[in-house]
Amino acid sequence: MTFEQLIPLIIMAFALGMDAFSVSLGMGMMALKIRQILYIGVTIGIFHIIMPFIGMVLGRVLSEQYGDIAHFAGAILLIGLGFYIVYSSILENEETRTTPIGISLFVFAFGVSIDSFSVGLSLGIYGAQTIITILLFGFVSMLLAWTGLFIGRHAKGMLGTYGEIVGGIILVGFGLYLLFPI
């Protein structure tokens, strides 16, 4: 994989991880122990590996069977997901956040990684390298979740919505780029 191929994946990994970062900011404002913060970040990272992997496998199958239609659908999926993230982050009300423990941690990690499934589906259609992509998505999401949790301990929610909006705009941009390559 060349450096030029790696840069878009890194940017996309940050776009996907912004959801975990934003939610972690709010969660970090609670009294969490360092061990809890580390565990939450690792769990989010693992889900950001599993979800795009499943999406990429499914995307490759669709690509082999449906070719150009799958290519177009993958781009539209990224654009739609990006707009949805922007829309929902602008309109969502501030909800009560609880510390995820046990099953609720898995539900939480699944919730913030569901968009990586869709992106994985699109990347699978385009034939992206699976191992590098999923490890990058997982690692960046874990780091962003930890960053959000630690910043949240010190700041009172300055970036939450804005982080999600930026992530959504980046996904829209990549979807448009796939539809209309420069």
From Swiss-Prot:
Any one Gene Ontology molecular-function term assigned to this protein's record: manganese ion transmembrane transporter activity
Main location as per UniProt: membrane
InterPro entries according to UniProt: Mntp/YtaF, Put_MntP
GO CC annotation, single: plasma membrane
Keyword match NAD: no
Membrane topology: Multi-pass membrane protein
Source organism, top-level taxon: Bacteria
Annotated localization: Cell membrane
Family, similarity comment: Belongs to the MntP (TC 9.B.29) family.
Name of the molecule in the record: Putative manganese efflux pump MntP
Organism (species): Bacillus thuringiensis subsp. konkukian (strain 97-27)
